Amino acid sequence: MAALSTARRVVIKIGSALLVDRTSSALRQEWLLSLAEDVARLKKQGKDVILVSSGSIALGRGALGLPRKDLPLEQSQAAAAVGQIRLARAYEEALAPHGITTAQVLVTLEDSENRRRYLNSRATLETLIGLGAVPIVNENDTIATDEIRYGDNDRLAAQVAVTVGADVLILLSDVDGFYSANPALDPDAKRFDRIEQITPEIEAMAGDGVSGLSKGGMITKLLAAKMATAAGCAMAISEGSVMSPVSALEAGAASTWFTAQGDPQVARKRWIAAMKTRGVITVDEGAAKALHNGNSLLPAGVRHVEGDFGRGDPLAILGPDGRKLGQGLSRYTAEEARALQGHRSDEIEAILGYAGRAALIHRDDMAL
């Protein structure tokens, strides 16, 4: 709970069983309005909030009159196409009365595996957050295949948390935490209040959920916890069907907290520092000083570009004496970087023919 009170950036994952009534397949409107009040309160506290929401297939299933049983892939994709519109509209209508602008961001797990797409999604999310909007991230189930079959929005939520450098990830689910065994089958199962480290013994305890709507079971939640905590993000599993579920969590509702393993930004920089570089950038004395002062690398300070690399690839950064200063992720291709080296940021559009980003390597994508 202390992690949530001090958090600067919070990602909240909402399972489809919370959003959609099991019997009628209708949206749980009153519950969503209470969640919107939670989001508005967090925003007033100065926190950034990102929502990762399941529910498009469940909503579309009801609209199309499809059965509640497992659907063939094509029908799942069709249901998602119908449900995504309804899902986006529901969040917009719930948050607009609080003066909050919402934005729909559709992603798949593949977006995290390709560095260029990863940087694109990260830049979009950061821009939306900077403009005060609340991104509603949803799996793009209309084109995804493995994600639909295995229901991996828990891991997707963890990836979003890692991407935006969140301090806390909250998985609102139909279970109230992590248990030593499946509580539906074992009356002696005990819930953990806090897990400091995910050990092989903890992994062996993971079972599967019993919901007919949410596909993500305890195994995917544990995978999400491993991903998030390794990146310095604390994670909570909490029963979310109650009204104002985040307020309930803060008030001490039953849950399991997974302890973050370090600071998110430090973890990210370690990840960047461990990458194999694809090219080399040599900078002048002024740029070297700017980097040591915590600034981004601008094209004007670049004196030489070496290698054949793409956007998002890791580059070594050398000082004017040839000494390695660090490394970072390039926001431009090698060809673009060579064209821009030595030029001011306000000349980028004239040189490339489009308005690119001011920094060649942003300080958040750099490890010195």
UniProtKB/Swiss-Prot annotation:
Location of this chain's protein in the cell: Cytoplasm
Entries under PANTHER family matching the protein: GLUTAMATE 5-KINASE (PTHR43654), ISOPENTENYL PHOSPHATE KINASE (PTHR43654:SF1)
UniProt GO molecular function: ATP binding; glutamate 5-kinase activity; RNA binding
Binding-site residues, ATP: K13, S173, D174
SMART domains: PUA
Alphabetized NCBIfam families for the sequence: proB (TIGR01027)
Annotated protein name in UniProt: Glutamate 5-kinase
Gene name, Swiss-Prot/TrEMBL: proB
GO biological process, one term: L-proline biosynthetic process
Listed EC numbers: 2.7.2.11
Keyword Transferase found: yes
